[in-house]
Amino acid sequence: MDDLFAAHDALAVADLIRTRKLGATEVLDGTLANLHRLNKSLNAITDFYDDAPPAADGPFHGVPYVIKQLMADCAGHPTTVGSKFFANQPVATADSAAVARMRRAGLVIVGRTNTSEFGLAPTTEPAFGGATINPWRNDLSPGGSSGGSAAIVAARGLPMGHATDGGGSIRIPAGLCGLFGLKPSRGRISLAPIGETLAGAGAQHCVSLSVRDSAALLDATAGSEPGDPYAAPSPSGSFLDATKRAPGKLRVAFVRKPVGGEALDPVLVRAIERTAKLLEELGHQVEEASPQYDAAALDAAFWRIMAANTWTNIQLRAAGRVPGPGDLEPVTQLVAERGRAITADEYIRSVQAFHRTGRALGAFFEKHDVLLSTTIARTSLPLGTVRMDGTLDAFDRRVAPMTAFTAVCNATGVPAMSVPIEWSDDGLPIGMHFVARYGAEETLYALAAQLEHARPWRNRRP
């Protein structure tokens, strides 16, 4: 059972259970035993649940799954958001809408995974609970803030795990852990019962070993709830079906550096060039071209919106409690204080900066179908690189290489994915980042499946 998910993805395991080649209880018990063993070295799972109800008869019937400690609630359990201040948060009285859909799809929720405090850092090293370790090398971070899910999936403890993304937090850990991770379009998966996150920048989905698992899970969880502020356009068919057809000849643009950013490490430039060549060999039209927008203004707007949301979310969740010394990590405290001071004028101008950038990206995608880069502007992420201390400017400088390619997708709501088809000379995964126009997840899934066939990654494991 230890190697079950090294050999089978989630859909395959569900089929084995459905055809009685494996028992659901056998899979659950064996998986839990393996997760406990792996977690001793990875520190990826914060809480194990032993009260999972019987699995529903859905496409993932009987497959164990984990939920990140952020942006999602599980009935009967607290959501800590990776913070000491919320360690004793009241238990949720109901599942979030997306979690309820996951259960209806047959997933068995067996625990919660680690995150940075409030998801503010693109790493997973919270003071509350401690750092999660990248299974590829124990001095490296798996990235974040969905690093708990990414680490346990990369270690083959599970075939996929829940992840959220407010600036890259699905794609960054997917890139650093050799996984597939797609951030859906704004409004594709409901965030109910909350209204929105980060002025529409927040999204949720999963990190996975296979492309088809991600697509099938999006089929199961996509769709709006009554009153949702956003709703993505309906796809032409199922996302799983998109993985079974050729993507056609796509117009692919690639960049060698972030918009407004510094030159990349030559290792990353070579990875981009190799991927561009592969895409040409697969029949796509490839050229070097970059969208044009004010990256500095977007970054400033992002931090203002994040700060305001952090302050408000602390107040809403605290229910009158006031954080004392040490209750919040230093950077979280500074971000919250900055958020409290932001004016309505500053906030509205920041939202307008999001929309200006969205229009610029929309114009770019009139001429191109896909934008290619690396997922992050680093080759790896040693533990301790993105510390939650010092000034906010210093923290921003530490974060910038991690989100240089990813955050714009959150600000504009477009779908994007990290695909593990490149590797460094020392054998570490390099995620390649692909962005498409709003609502075009089908394009990304068709391309991802083509790349998965051309450059298989499943057997490359820690």
Residue spans for each PLM region:
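Short helix-loop capping/hinge segments that flank enzyme active sites or metal/cofactor-binding pockets
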Residues: 60-84, 244-256, 305-362, 374-378, ...
